[in-house]
Amino acid sequence: PFTFHDKDGKLTGFDVEIIEKVAQKLGWKVEFKETAWDGMYAGLNAKRFDVIANQTNPSPERLKKYDYSAPYNYSAGVIVTKADNDSIKSFPDLKGKKSAQSATSNWSKDARDNGAIIVTVDSLAQNLGAVKQGRVDATVNDKLAVLDYFKKQPNSGLKIAVESDKKIPTGFA
């Protein structure tokens, strides 16, 4: 898990710990500002913060505007459906289906490019909740994040229906 709250409500995770170590080495003080996914780049543009450390993926459009760290991870996208949904076996099967997505994520673009009807939500939890509640047919998201969710919610009633062959890099912006 890259960013999450521990049992005491403290922000932690791989991204948090790496940024804290880098800041410590440079003698900087770190203040984390939690922001909805779709507002992260706007916050960077407005100089509300100096870096995005939340499993960000450089897209060609983003690389034109932002500097990124070297990738520290590569992850595939997955389509998550209800466990009893067998209608989605490939990315093209998303055509005409509702998919819960964060508006600005790379995975949202993949869902849209495959003909999904995008229902915009703010977070992975909302994506998966919308699938679980039957408000949407699927969500396309990062495999590692989904596997972490399944580890914490083994009886979620959801499944990974499809895994992408494409792996995208993750870094800090």
Question: Language-model segments: which ranges?
Answer:
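Alpha-to-beta junction loops
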Residues: 27-29, 45-54, 97, 133-145, ...
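Acidic, polar ligand-binding/catalytic clefts
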Residues: 16, 20, 24, 29-93, ...
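Short beta-strand-to-loop elements that line the ligand-binding cleft
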Residues: 29-36, 101, 116-124, 130
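Short glycine-rich His-centered loop
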Residues: 1-13
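Short loop/helix-cap segments at secondary-structure boundaries that form the rim of catalytic
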Residues: 44, 63, 108-114, 151-152
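Periplasmic-binding protein-like
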Residues: 73-81, 143, 147-173
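Short, hydrophobic alpha-helical packing/hinge segments within bilobed ligand-binding/sensory domains
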Residues: 18-19, 40-43, 107, 127-130, ...
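Short loop->beta-strand "edge-of-pocket" segments that line small-molecule binding or catalytic clefts
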Residues: 1, 91-104
